[in-house]
UniProtKB/Swiss-Prot annotation:
Binding locations of substrate: D21, F22, N23, R36, H59, L60, G61, R62, R119, R157
Stored InterPro entries: Phosphoglycerate_kinase (IPR001576), Phosphoglycerate_kinase_CS (IPR015911), Phosphoglycerate_kinase_N (IPR015824), Phosphoglycerate_kinase_sf (IPR036043)
Any one GO molecular function term: ADP binding
The protein, known as: Phosphoglycerate kinase
Compartmental location: Cytoplasm
Example of a GO cellular component annotation carried by this entry: cytosol
Lineage of the organism: Bacteria, Bacillati, Bacillota, Bacilli, Lactobacillales
Disulphide connectivity of cysteines: none
């Protein structure tokens, strides 16, 4: 990576500003999935072990008006982080002002402070989300000229807490998580060990057009599953029953199929049901066509076998999007089958591009078998599209 990293700067005695991604799910004030906090630990620990004073910034959820602040404080995160680090985490509970400044100035080497939810600044004119110049300058002024961006999950956004701070410090560098995310995903797409197979699922073609186009150029095969299968089917005149379809994307699907040179591989059968919820019948289709009055909710057994074959010998695999409604045991066989086909390949570099695929791997007990699971759904999608991420572009060149 041609950007400076946290290892390239002297941190001792410095107030180091760090953008982390602590946007974790909370239920009744309790964190239900702490993966993002765990993922940030190596960078935080490195900073404090080097004698730096870590000042952490993160958003949590969406905050547009005062009422939205309810249940969005980072207080539970501060407590969880303190337990994981085995030391106190200072939490002033504000995003600016004398209370924050005094707490920062009182920090000693090796201490950690967490600023309140950066999106609380969005209540008064979207200052965080619109990268307000004054806010970026103010937050930058709280440190000693070093900013570490370790929030891959927001790297595709230009906000005050990443791009804004970066523009106003002497050195803006990548943390370990950001460095690893870029290394795994970008290298997989730009310089893959071949054969390189991409697997794309999820419900909408519209979400993945740019990704499919980019990967058709880069990958040896692109396997398609999930709800978007049926838009590709209908574009070819195949009966899809009541399956999900994007009528306004039929031409796009047809165009992608025509220019794919056979690289785009669609399922050959489906698991169909007579309703999405409250169904009374579930069965495998004979071939591609879905029965009238039914809808496809997973790829079928023949497709699982065909995808298994397509993955044989693969050395690089990037997977983004489940093959079916994996949350329901009746429609998770496709997602499980594809995961198992990926991880059994000898010496494969296997990467999950965040979002629902990451949830599927974790929920179905296969997370530890993958080389890398991205922490950022939207950011990894934009990397797979070949886009430049603003949060990364803003960092200091080596």
């Amino acid at each position: 990576m041609a950007k400076l990293t946290v290892k390239d700067v002297d941190l001792k005695g410095k107030k180091v500003l760090v953008r982390v991604d602590f946007n974790v799910p909370l239920k009744d004030g309790v964190i239900t999935n702490d993966n993002r906090i765990t993922a940030a630990l190596p960078t935080i620990k490195y900073i404090i072990e080097q004698g730096g004073r870590a000042i952490l910034f993160s958003h949590l959820g969406r905050v547009k008006e005062e009422a939205d602040k309810e249940g969005k404080s980072l207080a539970p995160v501060a407590a969880d982080l303190a337990a994981k680090l085995g030391q106190d985490v200072v939490f002033p509970g504000v995003t600016r002002g004398s209370k924050l400044e005094e707490a920062i100035n009182a920090l000693e080497d090796g201490q950690v402070l967490l600023v309140e939810n950066t999106r609380f600044e969005d209540v008064d004119g979207k200052k965080e989300s619109k990268n307000d110049e004054e806010l970026g300058k103010y937050w930058a002024s709280l440190g000693d000229g070093i900013f570490v961006n370790d929030a891959f999950g927001t790297a595709h956004r230009a906000h005050a807490s990443n791009v804004g701070i970066s523009a106003n410090v002497e050195k803006a560098v990548a943390g370990f998580l950001l460095e690893n995310e870029i290394a795994y995903i970008q290298e997989a797409v730009e310089t893959p060990e071949r054969p390189f197979v991409a697997i794309l699922g999820g419900s909408k073609v519209s979400d993945k057009i740019g990704v499919i186009e980019n990967l058709l150029e880069k990958a040896d095969k692109v396997l398609i599953g999930g709800g978007m299968t049926y838009t590709f089917y209908k574009a070819q005149g195949i009966e899809i029953g009541n399956s999900l379809v994007e009528e306004d994307k039929l031409d796009v699907a047809k165009d992608l199929l025509e220019k794919s040179n056979g690289k785009l591989i669609l399922p050959v059968d489906s698991k169909e049901a007579n309703a999405f919820a409250g169904y009374t019948e579930v069965r495998d289709t004979e071939g591609e066509a879905v029965s009238k009055g039914f809808l496809g909710l997973d790829i079928g057994p023949k497709s699982i076998a065909e995808f298994d074959q397509a993955l044989t010998g693969a050395k690089t695999v990037v997977w983004n999007g489940p093959m079916g409604v994996f949350e329901n045991p009746d429609f998770q066989a496709g997602t499980i089958g594809v995961m198992d086909a990926i991880v059994k390949q000898p010496g494969v570099k296997s990467i999950i591009g965040g979002g629902d695929s990451a949830a599927a791997a974790i929920n179905l007990g296969r997370a530890d078998k993958f080389s890398w699971i991205s922490t950022g759904g939207g950011a990894s999608m934009e990397l797979l599209e070949g886009k430049v991420l603003p949060g990364l572009a803003a960092l200091t060149e080596k």
